[in-house]
């Protein structure tokens, strides 16, 4: 079972590291091409392109300039510990054991606008470049065209290495659009998390993102190998709803949170 998740805009390069083990990202040549494009952008360009404040634009122009082809523990940290958005609040990677990290290294991948596909312990320099960014490049007008089949091919390598043909899609639509499911050597299973609000069950972004992280952790901690076992996910009050699910979409619900 291979899990894919989205990255996060919020980053943490300050907290103590939960592991000293690390690996090198495998698509740095592609990242370098994108950095070369990004280095030509002014702060005003970045603010407009990414729809961010001048302060965040300045920060990321600086990051593009400082980015190095050499990844060290001085300028980088492991991706799974650097990302700190809602998904990663649910994942709580900082409390995983060494054995969990080892398992995650084989069974978890993070999609990324700049790095393409990251293993949990891959070193990552700080950046902001969301997959949906309309960044013109030599391969097209956006990052989906830039990455083409590269991410899908890398996922197929990971699928082959980990032993079965099930991919659990815990990524957002923006990021999973960078994957070509028809070219994947796997069945794609997409969990859907619905929370009760005012008597109605619906996908609430904040809760759904956190639930994706919690499910990733559940798979890692429990070494889940089958979809049947995945339906037993019950973290934080979620429960599987068979009658609303299909073979490819697993619906989980939760009662209203106070």
From Swiss-Prot:
Pfam families (alphabetical): H2O2_YaaD (PF03883)
GO biological process: response to hydroperoxide
An annotated GO cellular component: cytosol
Taxonomic superkingdom: Bacteria
Family annotation (InterPro entries): YaaA
Similarity comment: Belongs to the UPF0246 family.
NCBIfam families: PRK02101.1-1 (NF002541), PRK02101.1-3 (NF002542)
Protein name: UPF0246 protein VP0504
The organism of origin for this protein: Vibrio parahaemolyticus serotype O3:K6 (strain RIMD 2210633)
Lineage: Bacteria, Pseudomonadati, Pseudomonadota, Gammaproteobacteria, Vibrionales
